[in-house]
From Swiss-Prot:
Start and end residues of each BRCT domain: 640-718
UniProt-listed SMART domains: BRCT, HhH1, LIGANc
Keywords carried by this UniProt record: DNA damage, DNA repair, DNA replication, Ligase, Magnesium, Manganese, Metal-binding, NAD, Zinc
One Gene Ontology biological process: DNA repair
Catalytic activity, as annotated: NAD(+) + (deoxyribonucleotide)n-3'-hydroxyl + 5'-phospho-(deoxyribonucleotide)m = (deoxyribonucleotide)n+m + AMP + beta-nicotinamide D-nucleotide
The protein's name in its UniProt record: DNA ligase
Entries under SUPFAM superfamilies matching the protein: BRCT domain (SSF52113), DNA ligase/mRNA capping enzyme, catalytic domain (SSF56091), Nucleic acid-binding proteins (SSF50249), RuvA domain 2-like (SSF47781)
Keyword Signal annotated: no
Organism in which the protein naturally occurs: Rhizobium leguminosarum bv. trifolii (strain WSM2304)
Listed HAMAP family: DNA_ligase_A
């Protein structure tokens, strides 16, 4: 199922969960191509829009954040060609903003998190976002010792020999610098050097390069440093990793210090004191962009004070104190050749517009998701009109397609002047195109309104749903069975021989045994062989013991992504405890139900979906057979060395005065605590500020430890 194209607030939670699952896989694929192989298949604007879409969905549906979410990941795993380097401090990416309103929201979030009033000015830096390859360069006692790419943010590739060939990067620093210095910045190729290189390649009859960014990245990953040296790469310093001493206390002054040490820094960087100044500088840089000798794709804003940066801290993959304001993408006109229906794992029928191929910003676009029948008619999920009444999307229509923001590719509108007289309104099917079952629109339990998604009622008799469930089960972040991909699942599902059929998950693990007693041998079938079949059985057997969160995620419970599965595994510890809790929570009341809802990140909609899943006899029957074949491992509990609150569940209540609630939560979680929104038997500590009410009363009633803010600060500081 696919839903990219409509505003996130028009999506149901089911649509959002399915789209987040797909986005995680798609972005991971492009990360591997971009960061690991320097061979992107889509433009930066297209990639940014996918990330933007993912982030927007997670803001709207925080309970659906997945463990493999792009918001929890940076880049891609490092190549095996170069030796790995573990970064002393992670190299995180930045959140993106795409409009003035986004920038205003970012600045407001900084003030809000810090508890600052608008008249309590906070300075920001603003600098061009260089379109190159991120690099971390480590100096010890003033000498360059290691240079590493970002990689996945935790581990990069050792490219020290190649970095030494870049003339702009000093091999030695001046006397008096800290003993350990890690300079971070961007390696890039100047436009003029790129054009000169391509002219040289043409003269030699060789294939030319696509763009400066890919050329720079490929040049830096040469096994022969002489090739790198010939490419005239350049560098801008703008950040740091590990520093044994801090030479300054602001972002701006740190960068100026790097300049004093001999590193090139961007001359367009400014220190500014208001949103208006920030946006004005964005416009100024945008005007200068065509004349710059290097590619940029936006402007980066950072809180200037390092003390405030420390207070703001980090999200899973990005700092709260910085954002990248991206430049806008492009639009184009094309024709809707056909509207097709896809059926997803949850049965949702999603219309897809097949477009006459059109190039938008250097990338060929051939389709766009239309989300649901209301969207085709120009109506949002809340019933509001998102296009004029007669601007419904029809086959043969000329439409405006955009690749930017949180909707890529998105059909913005219909060009009515080009609509032909024979264009007919699209009739959305009332039956599933795969199995023929009725397709109905359900009542949204969260809003009480009719969902815009139409869903097949066929369940597991629907081939599309059943095969998608199996593909989800064996996917990379679930059971991850090598050799059992989409093509193989289709083969086993459709086969008529009982010894080769796989139509439910347990049958994956009985395949080898069934084959032993069968005359129809898998190894004799085209596409398989004795060696590959042996490897498949080995891969299956290696998954008979599986991490609990992977097992829960693999079940395919609606709304339960990887993040939720990990929260559940950590909270319940064993599958037996988890399954018992789901059974006891069936009445949607009582301690088990309350405990489930008290888990941070588990909302009522998600909790209800989990309980309903375990109420379905067929699901229980399949899981029972599955447990006979596999063993979910006991979940490992996170350990934060030296933290007195590691592993404890903490609830904050009342009006906090020493810190904001967001700041308190972030600090507690950084120390290994779990922050819950309600008090239960599993709560360990309740921190009560002035005005604490029912939560404090309940804590005392349950005998939970309570303390005020000063006692809490003393505890975590000790």
């Amino acid at each position: 199922m696919s839903t990219e194209g409509s505003a996130v607030d028009t999506l149901t939670i089911e649509e959002a969960a399915a789209e987040l699952e797909r986005l995680a896989k798609e972005i991971a694929h492009h990360d591997a191509l971009y960061h690991g192989k320097d061979r992107p298949q889509i433009s930066d604007a297209d990639y940014d829009a996918l990330k933007r879409r993912n982030d927007a969905l997670e803001v709207q549906f925080p309970e659906l954040i997945r463990e493999d979410s792009p918001s929890r990941r940076v880049g891609a795993a490092p190549s095996v060609t170069f030796s790995p380097v573990v970064h002393a401090r992670p190299m995180l990416s930045l959140d993106n903003t795409f409009s003035q309103e986004d920038v205003q929201d970012f600045v407001a979030s900084v003030y809000r998190f810090l508890g600052r009033l608008p008249d309590q000015s906070i300075a920001f830096t603003a600098e061009p976002k260089i379109d190159g390859l991120s690099m971390s360069i480590r100096y010890e006692n003033g000498r360059l010792v290691t240079a590493a790419t970002r990689g996945d943010g935790t581990t990069g590739e050792n490219v020290t020999a190649n970095i030494r060939t870049i003339a702009e990067i000093p091999n030695e620093l001046p006397k008096g610098v800290p003993a350990v210095v890690e300079i971070r910045g961007e390696v890039y190729m100047a436009k003029s050097d790129f054009l000169a290189l391509n002219r040289q390649m043409e003269a030699e009859g060789k294939q030319t390069y696509v763009n400066p960014r890919n050329t720079a990245a490929g040049s830096l990953r040469q096994l022969d440093a002489k090739v790198t040296a010939s490419r005239k790469l350049k560098f801008f310093a703008y950040a740091w990793g590990e520093m044994s001493e801090m030479p300054a206390d602001t972002q701006f002054d740190m960068v100026q210090t790097f300049k004093d040490w001999g590193f090139p820094v961007n001359p367009l960087m400014k220190r500014l004191n208001s949103v208006a100044d920030i946006l004005a500088h964005y416009d100024e840089i945008g005007l200068e962009r065509p004349d710059l000798d290097y590619d940029i794709d936006g402007v980066v804003y950072k809180v200037d004070s390092l003390e405030l940066q420390a207070r703001l801290g980090f999200r899973s993959r990005s700092p709260r104190w910085a954002t990248a304001h991206k430049f806008p993408a492009e639009q184009a006109f094309t024709e809707v050749e056909k509207i097709e229906i896809q059926v997803g794992r949850t049965g949702a029928l999603t219309p897809v517009a097949r477009l006459k191929p059109i190039t938008v910003g250097g990338v060929v676009v051939t389709n766009a998701t239309l989300h649901n029948e209301d969207y085709i008619k120009g109506i949002g999920n809340s019933g509001e009109r998102i296009r004029p009444e007669d601007h419904d999307i029809r086959e043969g229509d000329t439409v405006i397609v955009q690749r930017a923001g949180d909707v890529i590719p998105q059909i913005l509108d219909v060009v009515m002047e080009k609509r032909t007289a024979d264009a007919r309104s699209y009739e959305f099917p009332k039956t599933c195109p795969v199995c023929g079952s009725h397709a109905v629109r359900e009542v949204n339990e969260k809003t009480g309104k009719m969902d815009s998604v139409r869903r097949c009622t066929g369940g597991f008799i629907c081939r599309a749903q059943a095969t998608e469930h199996l593909k989800h089960f064996v996917s990379r972040n679930a059971f991850d069975i090598e050799g059992l991909g989409s093509k193989q699942i289709d083969f086993f599902f459709e086969h008529e021989d009982a010894s080769l059929q796989i139509r439910t998950a347990p049958e994956i693990f009985t395949l080898e045994k069934r084959q032993q007693a069968s005359l129809t041998k898998l190894e004799n079938i085209d596409g398989f062989g004795k060696v590959s079949v042996g490897k498949l059985y080995t891969a299956i057997n290696e998954r008979r013991s599986i991490a609990l969160h992977r097992f829960i995620y693999a079940l395919g419970i609606r709304h339960v992504g990887e993040t939720t599965a990990k929260l559940l595994a950590r909270s319940y510890g064993t599958y037996e405890a988890f399954a018992m809790a789901m059974k006891e929570a069936a009445p949607l009341s009582g301690d088990a139900w309350n405990d489930l809802n008290a888990i941070e990140g588990i909302g009522e909609v998600v909790a209800r979906a989990m309980v309903e899943f375990y109420k379905e006899p067929r699901n229980v029957e399949v899981i029972t057979r599955l447990i006979e074949e596999v063993t979910p491992q006991q979940a490992e509990q996170p350990v934060t060395t030296g933290s007195p609150v590691a592993g404890k569940t903490v609830v904050f209540t009342g009006s906090l005065e020493k810190f904001t609630r967001d700041e308190a939560k972030a600090r507690a979680e950084s120390l290994g605590a779990k922050v819950a929104g309600s008090v239960s038997k599993k709560t360990d500590i309740v921190v009560a500020g002035p005005g604490a009410g029912s939560k404090l009363d309940k804590a005392r009633e349950l005998g939970v430890q309570t303390m005020d803010e000063d006692e809490w600060l003393a505890l975590i500081s000790g």
